[in-house]
């Protein structure tokens, strides 16, 4: 992926950058793998906002991604590399030798015409999926399962990767992108390689309109609200927070407060936390 820099022909275009989409091979998705999406604008069934800053945006269709990769020992050929509006990573359309088509996350280095396969006997090659127990120490992986057969849940965004550090009993030690070291069942599957489109984080949207096209609404500062809307609100002119520390709109400390559930059963599987 390359970064395209726009000429400053207008104020909105100044400093704007975007992807050159050099890796994309087609603009037409596989129709059988598309699902309609309805917008909720962050509202629940009662019509109240439960997620702020959601709404608007370009109409999308969901691409059904195969995060499980359970079609074992059947070779699949990469047909296309496509753009997916629902995620930062690109996706690859693969066609199995039995004719079945599916989408997978496109790892770095995967190209049209290459083959991928899943299963315990699969080679350690980019795009192949196999159990953690069969992956050598030091290998970079992505799309990692937390429960066997549930499908990949970790390391799925553009440019992300994790590294296998070793095994301990029925668990495999994996260092995640954040630096956290976690024990994951060795029967869980992962895909070899780094997620592609790694320069996506360097894109400068340049103007508010591009953010609105993505379905993200403005974030309003609490200090410019009324006191009944936010703990920081009210006062004549610009005023300080007026509390010991900044607060969330619901009156809880906004900075430094640990949000992890102390009773989470998975805590015993975390060997090294992010800040240790």
Curated annotation (Swiss-Prot):
Residues 219-268 are annotated as: Disordered. Part of the 50S ribosomal subunit. Forms a bridge to the 30S subunit in the 70S ribosome. This is Large ribosomal subunit protein uL2. The keyword rRNA-binding applies. The keyword Ligase does not apply. Pfam families: Ribosomal_L2, Ribosomal_L2_C. GO terms for cellular component: large ribosomal subunit. Keywords: Ribonucleoprotein, Ribosomal protein, RNA-binding, rRNA-binding. One of its GO terms (biological process) is cytoplasmic translation. One of the primary rRNA binding proteins. Required for association of the 30S and 50S subunits to form the 70S ribosome, for tRNA binding and peptide bond formation. It has been suggested to have peptidyltransferase activity; this is somewhat controversial. Makes several contacts with the 16S rRNA in the 70S ribosome. Belongs to the universal ribosomal protein uL2 family. GO terms for molecular function: rRNA binding; structural constituent of ribosome; transferase activity. Disulfide bonds: none annotated. Signal peptide: none annotated. HAMAP family: Ribosomal_uL2_B (MF_01320_B).
């Amino acid at each position: 992926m390359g970064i395209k820099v726009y000429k400053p022909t207008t104020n909105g275009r100044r400093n704007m950058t975007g992807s050159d989409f050099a890796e994309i091979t087609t603009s037409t998705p596989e129709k059988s793998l598309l699902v309609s999406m309805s917008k909720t604008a962050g509202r629940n069934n009662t019509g109240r906002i439960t997620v702020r800053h959601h709404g608007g945006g370009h109409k999308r269709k969901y691409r059904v991604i195969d995060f499980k990769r359970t079609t074992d020992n059947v070779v699949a050929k990469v047909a296309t590399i496509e753009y997916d509006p629902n995620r930062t990573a690109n996706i690859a359309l693969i066609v199995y030798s039995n004719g079945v088509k599916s989408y997978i996350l496109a790892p770095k280095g995967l190209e049209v015409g290459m083959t991928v396969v899943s299963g315990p006997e699969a080679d350690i090659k980019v795009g192949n999926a196999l159990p953690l127990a069969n992956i050598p120490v030091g290998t970079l992986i992505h799309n990692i399962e937390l429960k066997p057969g549930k499908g990949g849940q970790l390391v799925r965004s553009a440019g992300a990767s994790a590294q296998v550090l070793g095994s301990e009993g029925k668990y495999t030690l994996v260092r995640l992108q954040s630096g956290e070291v976690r024990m994951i069942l060795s029967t869980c599957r992962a895909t070899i390689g780094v997620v592609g489109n790694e320069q996506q984080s360097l894109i400068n949207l340049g103007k508010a309109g591009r953010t609105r096209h993505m379905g993200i609404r403005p974030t309003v500062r609490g200090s410019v609200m009324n006191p009944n809307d936010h703990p920081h609100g009210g006062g004549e002119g610009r005023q300080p927070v007026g509390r010991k520390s900044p607060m969330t709109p619901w009156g809880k400390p906004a900075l430094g407060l640990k949000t992890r559930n102390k009773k989470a059963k998975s805590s015993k599987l975390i060997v090294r936390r992010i800040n240790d």
